[in-house]
Amino acid sequence: MAATFQNYSGGTFASDLITVPNFTAYLMQEVYERSAFVQSGVITRNSALDASAGGVRTVVPGFIPPTPFEEQMQSNSTWGDSGAGYLTPRKITASAGTATLIHRGLSFAVDELSKQASGTDPMAAIMGYMSSIINKNRTATLLSHLKGVFGTALAANTVDVSAGTGGAEYITASAVIRAKSVLGERGEDLSVLAMHPNVYFYLESQGMLVFSTSAMAPGNSVNWSGGGIGVTDTKVAYFAGMRVIMDSQLPVTGTGAAAVYTSYLFGPGVVQEGVQQALETASDRNILSFQDVVSFRYSYGFHIMGSSWNAVGDNPTNLELADKTNFGLVWDRKLIPIVELKCKSPYS
């Protein structure tokens, strides 16, 4: 059905591009393949969070690791904690957090005059950028979620070295190890380090990054050091034994030499994703304005293990996700494998 009598404003063409069979599936696959947070294992799919039967939030059950215990056994009728000659059964405690779902969409429109004027196809260009656009939107949502969780609930999982001097205010192996120690023995579970480019390139300038090609099998990996000489665009950086993600959307507060950068240390699968409505694509043609329009929508939610969405409402904006009053914990904070690390960079 044609669009109603109106002009799609704000647009820049080629609705046939999205009628190609399986285009939407290809686009969603590309989104996941281009997501460093997905490829590194930080984000994992959890079908229990999908709420495919309907709903605005999901309950996320989980078990709290039991405290180790044992009893001395003897050859009499009074041994054990029971005092009656038998072992006392213990229980494992379950906890249930809540995850909220979000519904997002975006749309582009272009007219034939813009195509004629530019000599190119603006809609084709738009479609080429879509996976990058959706990925940036997802990253912005994830970082807002992290800001909210670390505001109060996980504040104790933060290490701030930005007040240091003489180089101590920059990211170092010592700072990263200190951040890992916040979780005690569970600090060894942290395997991915996400940082801003200004932090990343400082490490690279110091020769502190080690690179490995992502195309090699783990048992046959080839490593280079000294700034990544000879490394192709498939390079994967490691620092202090952790895989590095570089993203310019990582939080920065302040400017210039006073800028403070927030990095995150993640354990595998600590961010779980539910998908209530997979990416849906639709297109239309307005014959009165000679415009093509394409729209996208998706419904999903991120959940950080051990946390809980405590707000009354659902389908939050990124601003609401960043609100520290909307989150609580259902696990002890040391059981949640995420640590926040704040530092400065000489490349600000």
Describe each model-derived feature in a short phrase.
Residues 2-40, 166-171, 205-348:
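Sequence/fold signature of self-assembling virion shell proteins
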Residues 24, 104, 199:
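A generic "binding-loop/recognition-motif" signal
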Residues 33-104:
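Assembly/oligomerization interface modules of large self-assembling protein complexes
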Residues 55, 187-189, 238-240:
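Short, well-ordered loop/turn elements at secondary-structure boundaries
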Residues 60-61, 91-154, 186-194, 279, ...:
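Long, contiguous amphipathic alpha-helices that act as assembly "spine/axial" helices in icosahedral shell
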Residues 67-72, 202, 254, 304:
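Short, solvent-exposed loop/turn elements at domain surfaces
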Residues 110-185, 325-348:
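Alpha-helical scaffold segments that mediate packing/assembly in large oligomeric complexes
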Residues 151-229:
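Extended, solvent-exposed, turn-rich assembly/linker loops in the middle of proteins
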